[in-house]
């Protein structure tokens, strides 16, 4: 029996979780589902500019697991862009990192939210 998967740690949970090509009705679209932990891997590597080892530590996974998550995420995003599919962001095995920044739901968009 395989061991249960370990939760990946994320710092960012998006408020907007659906993207679609302009001008195409929803009923005609196929979707790619991007897990929250996959989005976090892309964010850490491509936006934050972390190397894979540091990003893996932030997500509480091994470097090889991070590479797999990142590869899967990039493949899904590429398929959606090339094929004109919608992207739905949901699910995955993750936990939100506790922080002391007062950011409300850990959305981490440039620091704490102002009141």
Curated annotation (Swiss-Prot):
The text of the family note is: Belongs to the UPF0251 family.
Return the InterPro entries for the record.
Answer: RNA_pol_sigma_r3/r4-like, UPF0251, WH-like_DNA-bd_sf
Protein's organism: Natranaerobius thermophilus (strain ATCC BAA-1301 / DSM 18059 / JW/NM-WN-LF)
Q: Which SUPFAM superfamilies does the record associate with it?
A: Sigma3 and sigma4 domains of RNA polymerase sigma factors (SSF88659)
Q: What is this protein called?
A: UPF0251 protein Nther_2417
Q: Name one Pfam family in it.
A: DUF134
Q: Which domain of life is it from?
A: Bacteria
């Amino acid at each position: 029996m395989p061991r249960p998967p370990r939760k990946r740690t994320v710092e960012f949970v998006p408020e907007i979780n659906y993207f679609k090509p302009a001008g195409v009705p929803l009923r005609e679209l196929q979707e790619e589902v991007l897990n929250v932990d996959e989005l976090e891997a892309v964010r850490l590597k491509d936006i934050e500019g972390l190397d894979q080892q540091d990003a893996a530590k932030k997500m509480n996974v091994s470097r090889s697991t991070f590479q797999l998550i990142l590869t899967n995420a990039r493949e899904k995003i590429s398929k959606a862009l090339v094929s004109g599919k919608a992207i739905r962001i949901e699910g995955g095995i993750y936990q939100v990192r506790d922080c002391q920044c007062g950011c409300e739901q850990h959305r981490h968009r440039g620091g704490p939210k102002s009141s």
